[in-house]
Amino acid sequence: MRFLHLSDLHLGKRVCEFSMLDDQRYILEQILSLLDTRPVDAVLLAGDLYDKPVPPAEAVRLLDWFLPELADRKLPVFAISGNHDSAERVAFGAHLLAGSQVYVSPVFEGAPAPIPLTDAYGPVDIYLLPFLKPAMVRHIYPDEPIESYSDALGCVLRRCAPDPARRSVLVAHQFVAGAAACESEEPSVGGLDCVDAALFDGFDYVALGHLHSPQKVGRDTLRYCGTPLKYSFSEAHQHKSATFVELGPKGEVTLSTAPLTPKHDLRELRGSYMELTDRRSYAGTATDDYLHITLTDEQDVPDALARLRVIYPNLMRLDYDNLRTRTQADLDAPAQTEQKTPLEHFAAFYALQNNQPLSAEQAAFCQQLIETLWKEEDA
């Protein structure tokens, strides 16, 4: 049985105040084209369908277009809510959608029952587990000693108890200990929301969502597929892909990926203003990509953001890397302050801000201004 594993669509997301909706539709169309050439038996959507609990109307319309496109291809869809989603909103109409083989995890009310599929090797049980917090599980199982995310997940998965003689797939949205995170994910405080990878041992394949980098955790079949698009510059050097999973007889799982090409890549550029505005440096490149530019000029370039956007219209972020920004000079102790002249105070301030000393010309000019001010005060 073949599956396409997707997660973390984050429909409606904005990156540096740039809307990703057009890029998201583009990549979803590409995924549909992949499915037309690499047929599967079902699609797994492992949470964070939306970027916010109350998504914008345009994001809702985009998902409302994508799910029927999958259903029109006679593909069962198994979707769960993630930590960015509202479980209640994602589950709206779930009973009606199930009639079109679009199965959406309900609001958590206890261990999920398996949804069976069948192929030439027999049944495959699909378990849909939405994003869990300890408080959710304590509410359903008040007699269980649940202090951590691992306690909560373990409590639920013990009740799932997949049949070891049958193949089973779990769709979940949790932070598994040992996985690598990105800047675009919701911050984790001290790893408190981590869960133990061993909790998933009873499942043949675990389709995970939540982390944006494609990766396995421990075994190959405990896997994050990652986002279909880059959502932070910490992902600039990643190669996004769609994950295909094939279940053979019990114990045989084959994984493969297909590259996804975005409408606009998310890249980083570095150089001086003169270098980056030289036609030879950008001719033939995708200047409409989403960019983070780091200027190496020692002096700030006036109106640099607007001027660079003439060439790079989707410049998202502009920073400087120079002596001023690289290190910070130490502040003088108060005891030394009283012994310094006004020019020495200003020179120390200038060095603190720019990490380089006043030139002789600048010092002479400042001394002249100071003497003029002192004369005006004395008068």
Placement of each model-derived feature along the sequence:
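His/Asp/Glu-rich metal-coordinating catalytic cores
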Residues: 55, 84-218
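A conserved active-site cap/scaffold subdomain adjacent to cofactor or substrate pockets
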Residues: 197, 204-262
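Divalent metal-coordination and catalytic microenvironments
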Residues: 8, 28, 43, 48, ...
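Hydrophobic/aromatic beta-strand patches that form the interior of the parallel beta-sheet core
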Residues: 4, 44, 78, 105, ...
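N-terminal active-site segment of His-dependent metallophosphoesterases
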Residues: 1-68, 72, 362-372, 376
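Accessory, non-catalytic peripheral segments of nucleic-acid enzymes
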Residues: 37, 42, 247-379
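A short helix->loop->beta-strand "cap" motif at the edges of active sites that frequently abuts
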Residues: 72-77, 166
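Short amphipathic alpha-helical segments and helix-helix/interface helices
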Residues: 32, 64-68, 94, 157-158, ...
